[in-house]
Amino acid sequence: MRDAKPVGAAAARSLALPRVTRTALFLSAIVVLGLALRIWFIAANDIDPRYSAADDGDYYQRALRLAATGEYLDNSWLIRPPGHVFMFAAMLKAAMWLGDPTLGIGMIRGLHVLLSLLLIPVGYDLARRLFGRSAGLIFATLMAVWFPLVELPALILSEPLFLFMLTLHCWLLVRWRDSRRVPKARPALWLVGAGITLAMASLARSPAFYSAAFVLGFLLWETWDGGRWTVDGRRWAGWVRRWLVAALAFLVPFAAVIAPWTIRNYVVYERLIIIDTLGPVNLWMSMSDAVNEGRGEGEAKSILAGIPQEQRQEFVSDDIGRILREEPARLVRNFWPHFIHIWKAQFVEDYFVKVSFFTRPLRELWPLGALGDLLWLVFSLASVFALATRPREGGMRLLALGWIGYSCLTVMLIHVEPRYLLPVWLFMALYGAAALGALADWLALRRADRPAATKVARSYLRSPWGLAGLGLCAGLLALILTYRDYPRIIGAGVQRELQRSAGDRAYAAGDTQGAIAAYEQMLAIHPDFVDGRTDLARVYLELGRYDEGWAALGDRQTHRSDMLRGALSRGQGANDRAIFYFEDAEVRAGEDIQKLSLEWLRPTPVNALRLGNGLDFGYLDGFSFGEDGPPDLDGTPRSYRWLQGAGVIELPLPAPLREGNVVRLRAAGGVPGDTPLRVTIGDTTTTLPVRAGEWRTYRIAVPPELEGQQRLRITLAAPTFIPVQLNPAVGDARLLSVMISDVAVE
């Protein structure tokens, strides 16, 4: 007879969902928190690799070409790791398949956010397996909220892939260690994964390649069975055999992933270049005669620029050898200055010490940044206790110390850059979480059994391990606190920000004299603060007091201050100088200078605008760089800009719009046939069929509702294409739509 169906309470029990643990709920909550913080940062961030002349911009441009044509080109300056280019290209290709290449940047950032969030559960399990649940929860929280990791997916697109692969690699090594204790677990598969992930980290940042030596030390530690040595050496032979098997399981996939790239480099350059040439070139730059004698990196770069790409590594290696023979001390001359510069409160440094924010949204996110420095101080000081205690986590101690020492040595030899120190902070955060987790467990013991907790504490503090931890902690704290006069810096910095805020309020209210007074007080506190000088120069620019604007800017340069220099030059009629500053800022700024100039500048009212001549900043946004077209019949030069999908032109007019006014637009298409260009003026949208290869003039009536207004906003939109997809010979991987040379109101 068939069983009866459960009813009532029995039915409810049969449908019960799996029990959700408190740990799972906590991890889910901090993942959501981490996502919210990253979205907050992205919303406030203006930096965009499409406008960058730095690493991210190079990766983006080469990835766009790879996605469009399937052709990989090395950077003209250095042979760089290919990992980021391939990952960027995959996202850009997916955006092309979706029919909207402009989605590419968002998809790249989305993937980086995903990798950043995956660090939270992976980090939890890594720390839990090594040090226990409390350490895992603390480490996961750090992965979610620490400021450098929050800004990483949005700001520094060349690092999230490396950091995720490094963390995943460490987790796989620990999984291999644990699986060796489980019958029929096939632990070698975890080592295969560890080899693949370290190789992928190496193809994102080549220093990871050399950390394979640390992994071999980890395996050597973990394959020792803990027994005593035997006279006949059989136990030693078994240890070596186990280590060799484990090493091969790791090294074979590690080499298999990297080898195709090394072979490609040999085929292209006929040189053994394992991954890149960054390390030797950067070391040579820091040691070169030009830098050593105070002539700067510009001369060193010009020397390399005259040498073929494939010969640069050989040249710098030979010259480093010459320098070491002639002046060995030059290698270590910056060791101590660079070493103490590692141990600084990075957000305080960026916010109050540096001369500019360099477009980073530090002011908008200062609470998170300040919290980040406090967390860094806590986990750094705590980590030395865990790193100095009796090793109980196995070979991970070797791996962590290897990475910390190796990363510190790298920046001591070359230069200190925050992203190069990420492995240091990753492992110090891991061991800081271990120490803080042990403290949390001790506090729980103290609540349950105070005498037992007191005995444990006394035993540890009187042991060599405890004394070593206290000594290292005191030394590190002294190193951090003596590097900067933090109370003075923070106090002065707060006053600077208060004066700046007062100046901003006065400027927004139209009180230019009040704004000038507040900004001058700000600069009296921090004279080298270029961002503040730029704020003051904006006021003088708007007042037409150009000489005072130049004096306010001073000599230090940022891309935003150079944009102001361009505007001041334009106001004084020095057009050639204005073009130089505007176009240089546009190419190298790392943000959309057209958008910024449209927000910041109040250019001269005009009835007609020539696009692409270098003097159109403050009037438009959404266009590519200016280009020269064929001259008019009378020989007059004619410049233009490509619209990049969607853009806007805003014309401040010398007189109000009248009945009968029309907008004159001169445009040409880029792909065969007609390109539909949607032109929106007021509430009216007109679609123009823009013919490819033919410059035509189009006229659109100004809507009646705009009569009497003295500012005209024209919104443009058209489908995009990538020139290199149509003709690989042109090498142009930009997203373009139509060319526009002139806009006028008649």
Predicted regions and their residues:
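Transmembrane-helix signature of polytopic, membrane-embedded enzymes
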Residues: 102-106, 118-145, 163-164, 182-186, ...
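Multi-pass, polyprenyl lipid-linked donor-dependent membrane glycosyltransferases
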Residues: 54, 83-84, 107-115, 138-173, ...
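Membrane-interface transmembrane helices that cradle and orient dolichyl/undecaprenyl
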Residues: 130, 169-191, 201, 219-229, ...
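Membrane-interface anchor segments at the N-terminal boundary of transmembrane helices
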Residues: 107, 331-400
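Loop-to-helix entry region of an early transmembrane alpha helix in multi-pass inner-membrane enzymes
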Residues: 82, 86, 97-121, 152, ...
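Membrane-proximal stem/loop segments at transmembrane-domain junctions that anchor or position
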Residues: 266-349
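Membrane-proximal lumenal/periplasmic loop motifs of glycosylation machinery
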Residues: 44-57, 67-89, 322
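Transmembrane-helix motifs of polytopic, lipid-linked glycan transferases
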Residues: 107-131, 168, 172, 381-385
